[in-house]
Amino acid sequence: MVLERTLSIIKPDAVAKNVIGDIYSRFEKAGLKIVAAKYKQLSRREAEGFYAVHRDRPFFNALVEFMISGPVMIQVLESENAVARHRELLGATNPKDAAPGTIRADFAESIEANAAHGSDSVENAAIEVAYFFAATEIILR
C-alpha cells in the first residue's frame, strides 16, 4: 500500500460559512486522514508565494486579495491516491460545473470563492505541503 499526501486549504469563504467540520467529515468518510492542520490568517507574502505559479495570470491579484481576506484552514491529508481522492471530493474548480454533492457544489459561491484548494499532482502536493508544514508538524497515524 502506497500512501500519498496532499495539501488542502479551506478558503476564507468556506471558513466564514462555518463549514470546516462538514468538510472534515467528508474527508474522513472518504478515507482521507488529517495528519497535520493549521488555522491561520495568511499574510500577503505567504499568499503571493504560494500562488507564485499564477503571478503572470490576470486573476493573480484578486486571488491573493481573496486568500488574505479572512482566515483559512490548511491541512495535510493522507491516504492511497490522496491527490485524486481529494480532488474528486472538491469537484470542478468552477462550482457551476461541479457535480452535485461535491464540496464546491455544496459550499462555493463562484470560481473565485470556490471553498477549497487541493494539490493537482503528487509532485505539487509535496511542494505545497512543505510550503506550510515542517516535517516535524506532520504526525503519522
UniProtKB/Swiss-Prot annotation:
Keywords for the protein's UniProt record, in alphabetical order: ATP-binding, Cytoplasm, Kinase, Magnesium, Metal-binding, Nucleotide metabolism, Nucleotide-binding, Phosphoprotein, Transferase
Binding site for ATP: 11, 59, 87, 93, 104, 114
Catalytic activity: a 2'-deoxyribonucleoside 5'-diphosphate + ATP = a 2'-deoxyribonucleoside 5'-triphosphate + ADP; a ribonucleoside 5'-diphosphate + ATP = a ribonucleoside 5'-triphosphate + ADP
A molecular function GO annotation: ATP binding
Cofactor: Mg(2+)
Location in the cell: Cytoplasm
Alphabetical list of PROSITE patterns matching this protein: NDPK, NDPK_LIKE
Protein task: Major role in the synthesis of nucleoside triphosphates other than ATP. The ATP gamma phosphate is transferred to the NDP beta phosphate via a ping-pong mechanism, using a phosphorylated active-site intermediate.
Similarity comment text for this entry: Belongs to the NDK family.
Subunit structure: Homotetramer.
Protein name from the UniProt record: Nucleoside diphosphate kinase
